[in-house]
Amino acid sequence: MKAELIAVGTEILTGQIVNTNAQFLSEKMAELGIDVYFQTAVGDNEERLLSVITTASQRSDLVILCGGLGPTKDDLTKQTLAKYLRRDLVYDEQACQKLDDFFAKRKPSSRTPNNERQAQVIEGSIPLPNKTGLAVGGFITVDGISYVVLPGPPSELKPMVNEELVPLLSKQYSTLYSKVLRFFGIGESQLVTVLSDFIENQTDPTIAPYAKTGEVTLRLSTKTENQALADKKLGQLEAQLLSRKTLEGQPLADVFYGYGEDNSLARETFELLVKYDKSITAAESLTAGLFQSTLASFPGASQVFNGGFVTYSMEEKAKMLGLPLEELKSHGVVSAYTAEGMAEQARLLTGADIGVSLTGVAGPDMLEEQPAGTVFIGLATQNKVESIKVLISGRSRLDVCYIATLHAFNMVRKTLLKLENLL
């Protein structure tokens, strides 16, 4: 099956926003075994949009349009597609009810007539409910070509795709089953080298490596009759892959941490904290609260996290955490001493089971004769205080902070897994 993605919105063409939906949708289609052959961006213009739809319909089996479902005059995706298909627009009852519920809590004047457009679908289409917004999506097949309309905001598009479109397409088209393995602590080039014979000789299942910021994923895919057979084939391949060793002789299984396209080190760590009923706190310097905000983003975070510290300057480390200022000056803020002291004091001051700290040089300049990207991460429990030194070179400030946070979550995760092995 050949698919085409059409992003609708003048703001994409003028560079006001980045079309991240294309990457997300391409990944989702790949998971389903649907080949995306073309990606197009078009402005808010009916004539040009009609031309793009016409071209897509002549060369693709599945046409996915994103954006232009809102209430304003330049939101014309559904109207233009309906015109092309010679279909009327009708109101979806569920979407109308959502509009009623939404505006019932607001001033009557806020419900202008143009808002009703968001509840319209093309006659004969399958509505795709919008869990996080008001504009309903839709799926329709005409003359052997399937068309999908999706909202533009990623916060609305992603839930609609994951919860509505993917299950729908899976029933109709997909025979491809996939499993995503996630790795941290090994680069893509080394992982590909270690698994080169598997990758070069692959048939079915297939192996596709992807480099992410600070980590790597492997997508294992197979075409088979059902999920049970797929699980067996993919499970056998996974076991073979994880039995390999890195170039340093470390078992590849040691740098594997979980499954799933939407998984993360933070999520794995959070779930282990919940599982073992352990609380955590953090004292952050260069990351300025990134570790804590990531942890707090998970529903139920209050089960394991009550609060922590952001101590950017040396003086605040002394003031808020009670670390001796003269010792901080002697050892420097970019040091194992400071990282371990921050972690232990944070743990003691909050009564948490685990204390984590991050201190270092985000860059681009050196600090205390340490190069940019030098990070010390401390971890304190009731029985032990330790730290690791990480060098994240050749990265932007944002990447240094993000990857440092990944290292911190991984350090906590490994500590909790050791606890698991002792139970």
UniProtKB/Swiss-Prot annotation:
Lineage top rank: taxon: Bacteria
Signal peptide (from-to): none
Pfam family, one: CinA
InterPro entries per UniProt: CinA, CinA-like_C, CinA_C, CinA_KH, Competence-induced_CinA, MoaB/Mog-like_dom_sf, MoaB/Mog_dom
PANTHER family, sorted: NICOTINAMIDE-NUCLEOTIDE AMIDOHYDROLASE PNCC, NMN AMIDOHYDROLASE-LIKE PROTEIN YFAY
Family from the record: Belongs to the CinA family.
Protein name (database record): Putative competence-damage inducible protein
Naturally occurring in which organism (per UniProt): Streptococcus pyogenes serotype M3 (strain ATCC BAA-595 / MGAS315)
Gene that produces this protein: cinA
